[in-house]
């Protein structure tokens, strides 16, 4: 696991969400014949891939960086795992639809599961930033 894998996964999921906001605003009834149609599926696929094993990557980062006290970090692992799993299920459900309309994406954007996940990611990414900075400083010093 690279030191920035959590950050990379967070960015992939956030980029998908931002693209979905734009896609939802287009008022498309389906995803055929639109340049955005292939893109929305690709963004969703990448987000789904980033979600796979996300909690395990977080746990490995806590362990490899010896974050102390470990208990609060590991307790949050259950929250992240639940929210990532629910979001992945929702994304996979949308990917199974043909076509993917703007309204469907708007409903996915409004999903409490996806919103909870995004909040989790913002929190985890922000907490890990000082850890990345300290790790980088230790390597270059």
Outline where the language-model segments fall.
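Amphipathic protein-protein interaction modules
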Residues: 59-109
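A generic "alpha-helical surface" signal
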Residues: 4, 11, 45, 78, ...
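Alpha-helical transition-metal enzyme core signature, strongest for iron centers
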Residues: 13, 47, 51, 84, ...
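Charge-rich, acidic-biased intrinsically disordered regions
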Residues: 34-39, 66-76, 107-113, 133-141
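Amphipathic alpha-helical binding modules
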Residues: 87-140
């Amino acid at each position: 696991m690279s030191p920035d894998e959590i950050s990379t996964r967070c960015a992939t999921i956030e980029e998908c969400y931002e693209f979905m906001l734009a896609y939802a605003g287009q008022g498309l009834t389906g995803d055929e014949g639109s340049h955005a149609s292939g893109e929305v599926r690709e963004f969703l696929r990448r987000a789904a891939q980033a979600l796979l094993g996300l909690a395990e990557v977080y746990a490995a980062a806590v362990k490899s960086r010896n974050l102390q006290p470990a208990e609060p970090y590991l307790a949050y692992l259950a929250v992240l795992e639940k929210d990532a799993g629910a979001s992945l299920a929702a994304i996979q459900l949308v990917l199974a639809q043909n076509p993917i309309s703007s309204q469907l994406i708007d409903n996915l954007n409004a999903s409490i599961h996806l919103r909870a996940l995004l909040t989790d990611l913002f929190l985890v990414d922000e907490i890990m930033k000082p850890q990345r900075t300290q790790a980088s400083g230790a390597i270059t010093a």
